[in-house]
UniProtKB/Swiss-Prot annotation:
SUPFAM superfamilies: RNA-binding domain, RBD. Disruption phenotype: Plants produce threefold the number of leaves, and leaf size and plant height are strongly reduced compared to wild-type. Shoot apical meristem (SAM) shows a higher rate of cell division and internode elongation is significantly reduced. Some inflorescence branches are converted into vegetative shoots. InterPro entries: EAR1-like_RRM3, Mei2-like_Rrm_C, Nucleotide-bd_a/b_plait_sf, RBD_domain_sf, RRM_dom. GO terms for molecular function: RNA binding. PANTHER family: RNA RECOGNITION MOTIF-CONTAINING (PTHR23189). Residues 98-177, 223-295, 458-559 form the RRM domain. Gene3D superfamilies: 3.30.70.330. Probable RNA-binding protein. Involved in the regular timing (plastochron) of lateral organs formation. May regulate the rate of leaf initiation and the duration of vegetative phase. Seems to be redundant to the function of PLASTOCHRON1, but to act in an independent pathway. Residues 294-417, 596-683 are annotated as: Disordered. Residues 328-340, 379-403, 605-624, 637-651 have a biased composition (Low complexity). This is Protein terminal ear1 homolog. Transmembrane segments: none annotated.
């Protein structure tokens, strides 16, 4: 043991033995450390239980496959006689009219091609294709209202048919792709004409034009009015008479005048034929007076149509594109060629129509040709309608201005240039009354206000007379007007003689200071018809003398009749030195051929001396004007028609005087000769 122990550890003799001794003690260093090692207390280890395993949701099984059925091929259906239009095509979005608006029109489609596409529905009157290139919109006008209705229905039906064709073609293509590589030809199930309602092979859409863009005159609506039928004649009897000329849409009786009856045709050509055949025809002992109805007056009734406007309104450029065809004239109106040149307005007015105008207007004659009775057995009421439509704005414009001016005394007098008229509406000529009185018929259309056409007033007031105009020039103007009017009456009247134009009173108020008129004058005609003829010839016409820019205005005077005028000027004296400044009467009446000398109606008082007038300041112009003349005005003198007119006469006298005269008789004859030479009536 000792050998083994000594030799193994100390003398390294037992090198082959294990160097580690399992029985050796733990080694601790002999040197004391500053922080002696402390044995840690015994720790207990408590392991946590393992978490429960996660529950994995099972994946739902995929849904069973659903097979989409292949759409069956459309079955071929035989055409059925009871075929009806689809419900969508029967919807009408506006009031039916003869104007049809087409949209989605190919931009390169010409007018003739559009007319050719619409011709299967009925006769086409006109086509407006001005907006096709920019908006694809065209307006087609038909003669027959039923043709327009068929066109709207047919075009919409064709449009819906094309949409259904697309669906059928898609279904056929899907079925062909699943079965065979080639497409079978589709079988259409609607009996139809493939080209009906297509424009250049393209489907379009149609709707009726807006009511505000459709012409409202009788010629465009096929509407006639019978003015003097027997009140006992029923609408059924009248329908049978007019039914011989075409299909009648409606016959109704005027609520205000039982003798006036309205007849509306489906076709405007039938209405025109009935007008020419029945106007002036004897029926039950009475001559019929047939004419086109006039346009409706603007108002709440007209504006009430707004709720019926189509969903797709007419483009703005189409609203002014309508150009109604001129209605055939009721009778030829030859221009009068009497003794030399009828010089109405020789030194008065420049007619608005040119020298080359024909028909109802002759040179210088103006509208006077409308008053005469038409030839060929036709009633004068037809010419009355033409005259009323030709100058429909002559009385309405002053009426609107008078409403703005606040009645009868709102305007300033004098030249009336650029100012609003202020006379009362009761002194204005009413156009329906004027036309009916000129034609000798008391009946009027229901579209106008129910006013009596038997106006008995004969005294008129001529306004806006150039201040250099004298009584001699005014007499010459009236004489030529009477000559021309009477020549037309003699040339046209065959059955019923109308009263000739003549006058028996004339007064041109003068400013006694500057010897110039104050801008207005008074004339009493011998008949209401003559007053209407003077109004129609001179109203709203420019003057042609002294380079004046004034526009003539003609109204009724406040004092009416020769007897009332004589009573008005009774016991009056004017402070003037010439009879030319006085109101004058003519006995017998003067008509241009019978040149009755004027007889002063009042006396003259001594005029103030010129020396005293030159040294003293000028008096007020209102004091130098006859106050009785101001009372003849249609409005009180406070309105400016009297004194204000006189106060402005000085300025207008200088403006209208191109001859350098200051008034009086000195420039009258010379001015008349110069004007006649300038107009070509003298050498």
């Amino acid at each position: 043991m000792e050998e083994g122990g000594g030799s193994g550890v100390g003398g390294m003799q037992g090198a082959a033995s294990n160097l580690l001794d399992a029985g050796a003690q733990a080694f601790y260093p002999a040197v004391g450390a500053p922080f002696p090692f402390q044995q840690l207390p015994h720790q207990l280890y408590c392991p946590q239980p393992p978490p429960p395993p996660y529950q994995v949701m099972p994946v739902p099984p995929p849904p069973p496959p659903v097979g989409l059925p292949v759409p069956p091929l459309p079955a071929t259906m035989a055409p059925q006689p009871g075929y009806c239009v689809p419900a969508a095509a029967t919807v009408v979005d506006g009031p039916a009219s003869r104007a049809v608006v087409l949209s989605l029109v190919p931009p390169h489609a010409p007018e003739d091609e559009i007319a050719r596409a619409m011709a299967p529905f009925g006769a086409v009157r006109a086509v407006d294709a001005s907006a096709v290139a920019s908006e694809g919109v065209a307006t087609v006008y038909f003669f027959d209202l039923r043709s327009a209705e068929h066109a709207v229905t047919g075009v919409r039906e064709q449009h819906i048919r094309q949409q259904c064709r697309l669906g059928q073609l898609y279904a056929a293509a899907a079925a062909a792709a699943a079965s065979s590589p080639t497409w079978p030809p589709p079988a259409w199930d609607w009996p139809h004409d493939d080209n009906r309602g297509l424009v250049l092979g393209q489907a379009v859409w149609a709707h009726f034009a807006a009511a505000s863009t459709v012409p409202d005159d009788g010629a465009s609506r096929g509407s006639l009015v019978v003015l003097n039928s027997l009140p006992a004649m029923s609408v059924f009897e009248l329908r049978e008479i007019f039914q011989a000329y075409g299909d009648v849409k409606d016959v109704r009786e005027s609520a205000l005048r039982p003798s006036n009856k309205f007849v509306e045709f489906f076709d405007t050509r039938d209405a025109d034929r009935a007008l020419h055949e029945l106007n002036g025809k004897e029926l039950f002992g009475r001559r019929l007076v047939v004419e086109y109805t006039r346009p409706s007056l603007p108002g709440p009734r007209r504006r009430g149509h707004v709720s019926h406007q189509p969903l797709a309104p007419t483009p703005p450029r189409l609203q002014a594109a309508w150009r109604p065809a001129p209605a055939p004239s009721q009778s030829a109106q030859p221009s009068s060629s009497g003794s030399g040149k009828a010089r109405e307005g020789v030194v008065l007015l420049r007619r608005s129509s040119g020298k080359g105008s024909s028909g109802s207007q002759s040179k210088g004659g103006g509208n006077a040709g409308h008053e005469r009775k038409s030839k060929g057995g036709k009633s004068a009421a037809a010419a009355c309608s033409t005259a009323a439509s030709a100058s429909s704005s002559t009385a309405t414009a002053p009426s609107k201005q008078s409403q703005k001016g606040g009645g009868g005394g709102g305007g300033r007098g004098g030249s009336w240039r650029g100012q609003k008229s202020g006379w009362e509406a009761r002194f204005l000529f009413k156009e329906p009354e004027a036309a009916a009185a000129a034609a000798g018929d008391a009946a009027a259309s229901e579209t106008h206000e129910p006013a009596s056409c038997k106006d008995t007033r004969t005294t008129v007031m001529i306004r806006n007379i150039p201040n250099k105009y004298s009584q001699k020039l005014l007499l010459n103007m009236l004489d030529n007007h009477c000559i021309l009017s009477n020549q037309q009456i003699e040339a046209s009247c065959e059955d019923e003689a109308q009263p000739f134009s003549s006058y028996d009173f004339l007064y041109l108020p003068i400013d006694f200071n500057n010897k110039c008129n104050v801008g207005y004058g008074f004339v009493n005609l011998t008949s209401p018809e003559a007053a209407v003829r003077l109004y129609k010839a001179f109203h709203k016409q420019p003057w042609e003398v002294f380079n004046s820019r004034k526009i003539c205005q003609v109204t009724y005077a406040r004092v009416q009749g020769l007897d009332a005028l004589k009573e008005h000027f009774k016991n009056s004296k004017f402070p003037c030195d010439s009879d030319e400044y006085l109101p004058v009467v003519f006995s017998p009446p003067r008509d241009g051929k019978l040149l009755t000398e004027p007889v002063p109606l009042v006396g003259r008082s001594p005029a103030p001396s010129s020396a005293s007038g030159a040294s003293s300041p000028p008096k007020s112009c209102a004091a130098s004007v006859d106050p009785l003349a101001q009372e003849l005005m249609t409005a009180p003198s406070s309105s400016g028609d009297g004194a204000s007119s006189a106060s402005s006469s000085n300025a207008h006298a200088d403006e209208d005087d191109v001859h350098g005269e200051t008034g009086g008789d000195r420039g009258d004859d010379a001015g008349l000769d110069l004007e006649l030479q300038r107009l070509g009536y003298t050498d």
